[in-house]
Amino acid sequence: MRRSTHTRRRLLLGGLGLLGLGSLLAWTSLPFGAQPVSTVAVTRADIESSVTALGTLQPRRYVDVGAQASGQIRNLHVEVGDQVHKGQLLVEIDPSTQQAKLDAGRFSIDNLKAQLAEQRAQLKLAQQQLKRQRDLAAVGATREEDLQTAEAQLNVTQARIDMYQAQIRQANASLRSDEAELGYTRIFAPMDGTVVAVDAREGQTLNAQQQTPLILRIAKLSPMTVWAQVSEADIGKIQPGMTAYFTTLAGGKRRWTSTVRQVLPIPPKPLDQTSQGGGSPASATAGATGSQVVQYTVLLDVDNPDGALMAEMTTQVFFVVGQASQVLSAPLAALDDSDNEGLRLAQVFGRDGKVEQRKVRTGLSDRLRVQILDGLSEGDRLVIGAPAASGG
């Protein structure tokens, strides 16, 4: 029994020795310094060259509703999110001051009309007196002075009538202005849309004498406009009408497709330098050294039938510069720069195990792959990270 155990132990030790010897022989048979080669194949793929930018969503159409009349807000009939229709009553301002002014204007007109009626009566009397004086003068029964006085009285009365008529016309014009001011105390929706902001409250006093107080904003949430900020280096590639698409943080993988409507000719600046209007976000950002990155604003519109797009959402925009479908392509990492413009260098791994360097003409490129126009064939294996080969 003990002898059998010693025999098995000798056999086990002998097998381990033979295994170690075989490994040593295999290791010494490999070429010294040989390294594994990583390769990728030239395949067909869809290539899309694009310019990326960040943007902000804004309603294409909106209006800020302000107050043209001063006074206290008596009733505010809408809240943020309410749907409104053109002509709908939104706000009522206390009309006491405007109503009193209108009443005073009407009373003034009544007074002027009464004085006008009096002068017309005086005109009739002056006409009768002048006729009497002329009749008497015809038979020499009155003085010339009395005749002249009657004529002057008639002219004065007619002038007063003209004056009161002019004053009534002036008062009527003021009355129309007062009526308009009274109408301003009732504010109506200028268009259909959604109330997206309310900046006033019931009981708040408005002063419209110096500037127009803003009360609320109404916007149409379809279509929406993306205000995209494109860097100075890329703005030359952007043209009106070119295809673009964008994503939002809330939309996940959903894409919205559109076309460029407009490229604004100057970059927006802070309000203390110039006023851009239109809800344009600032696009010049200062770095730690105080230098500014110049960015230009590009506008594109998109329909929003389901309301998934909301104001102030951040978007990532892709402006499609070029597209190619199922073309020969290779990873950018597999190509090196060349001295010749438009040509790249590729290390092709042959079937014989040798590496051949080729000059490759390329086309469109995205962030990962580049289109192969000439120099490579489908199925070629390209070496990644290998030293430059001879030939080519």
Swiss-Prot record:
- Answer whether the UniProt record assigns the keyword Transmembrane to this protein: no
Pfam families named in the record: HlyD_D23
Which residues form each disulfide bond in the chain? none
Effect of loss of the gene: Deletion of pvdRT-opmQ leads to reduced amounts of PVD in the medium and decreased growth under iron limitation. Deletion of both PvdRT-OpmQ and MdtABC-OpmB systems strongly affects growth under iron limitation as well as PVD secretion.
Q: Which family does it belong to?
A: Belongs to the membrane fusion protein (MFP) (TC 8.A.1) family.
Sorted keywords for this record are: Coiled coil, Periplasm, Signal, Transport
Traced from the root, the source organism's taxonomic lineage reads: Bacteria, Pseudomonadati, Pseudomonadota, Gammaproteobacteria, Pseudomonadales
Protein's UniProt name: Pyoverdine export membrane fusion protein PvdR
**PROSITE patterns, A to Z:** TAT
Its biological function?
Part of the tripartite efflux system PvdRT-OpmQ required for the secretion into the extracellular milieu of the siderophore pyoverdine (PVD), which is involved in iron acquisition. This subunit is an adapter protein that stimulates the ATPase activity of PvdT and connects the inner and outer membrane components. The system is responsible for export of newly synthesized PVD after the final steps of biosynthesis have taken place in the periplasm.
Primary location group:
periplasm
- Keyword Signal assigned to the entry: answer is yes
Q: Please give the superkingdom of this protein's source.
A: Bacteria
Q: Which NCBIfam families is this protein grouped with?
A: RND_mfp
Q: How is it modified after translation?
A: Predicted to be exported by the Tat system. The position of the signal peptide cleavage has not been experimentally proven.
* Signal peptide feature range: 1-36
**Annotated localization:** Periplasm
Describe the subunit structure.
Part of the tripartite efflux system PvdRT-OpmQ, which is composed of an inner membrane component with both ATPase and permease domains, PvdT, a periplasmic membrane fusion protein, PvdR, and an outer membrane component, OpmQ.
GO annotation, biological process: xenobiotic detoxification by transmembrane export across the plasma membrane
Q: What GO molecular-function term can you cite, just one? A: efflux transmembrane transporter activity
The record's listing under InterPro entries reads: CusB_D23, MacA_alpha-hairpin_sf, RND_pump_MFP, TAT_signal
